[in-house]
């Protein structure tokens, strides 16, 4: 057995410790990760809004008192560059209202990062922008995004909230569409749901 087969890897890179920093809008950026880089193996920065619809939603949410990022692709590139040379495997948590928005990001940064689709946010402006939990309720649209990113040859993660829909069905659909990672929020359901998802697909679970 090769040594690489005995250790966890994400996006083809070794994970030094199985602790991952999750995205928190307006909070988890490169500086946040650097301050904690000695203690984590991977990190997802963002969420970042990719198009007019999601940027408008983020602005509305910010005006309501939530923290949000306003970074465009150039600013995201700067964040990625700040983490060059670290041993933290990096992912971007992304919000887009169309498949094309995700593909544009993938063509900007290629396989330097993991692309995490935000199917998690339950704020109404983001749902109305056809993002976040909208994608859980409309899994055909979510799987279209996964397939498009997979076709670009990049590593695809989906951040989801357990218990919103049939988790086992969704896990199987995302696996078939080409997802590599499921990032599951168990806050509302408890840890027992993870076994159901694990038994439904062979994807890496966070």
Question: At which residue positions do the language-model features occur?
Answer:
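Alpha/beta enzyme core
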Residues: 32-38, 42, 99-206
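N-terminal capping/small domains of soluble enzymes
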Residues: 1-100
């Amino acid at each position: 057995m090769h040594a690489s087969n005995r250790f966890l890897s994400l996006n083809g890179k070794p994970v030094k410790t199985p602790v991952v920093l999750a995205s928190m809008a307006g909070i988890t950026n490169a500086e946040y990760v650097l301050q904690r880089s000695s203690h984590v193996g991977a990190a997802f920065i963002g969420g970042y809004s990719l198009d007019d619809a999601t940027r408008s939603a983020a602005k509305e949410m910010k005006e309501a008192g939530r923290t949000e990022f306003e970074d465009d692709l150039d600013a995201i590139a700067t964040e990625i560059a700040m983490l060059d040379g670290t041993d933290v495997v990096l992912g971007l948590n992304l919000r887009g209202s169309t498949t094309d928005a995700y593909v544009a990001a993938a063509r900007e940064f290629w396989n330097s990062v993991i692309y995490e689709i935000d199917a998690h946010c339950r704020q109404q402006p983001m749902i109305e922008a056809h993002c976040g939990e909208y994608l859980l309720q409309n899994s055909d649209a979510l799987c279209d995004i996964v397939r498009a990113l997979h076709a670009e040859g990049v590593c695809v993660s989906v951040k989801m909230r357990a218990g919103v829909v049939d988790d086992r069905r969704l896990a199987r659909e995302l696996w078939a569409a080409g997802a590599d990672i499921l990032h599951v929020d168990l806050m509302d359901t408890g840890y027992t749901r993870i076994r159901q998802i694990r038994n439904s697909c062979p994807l890496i679970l966070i």
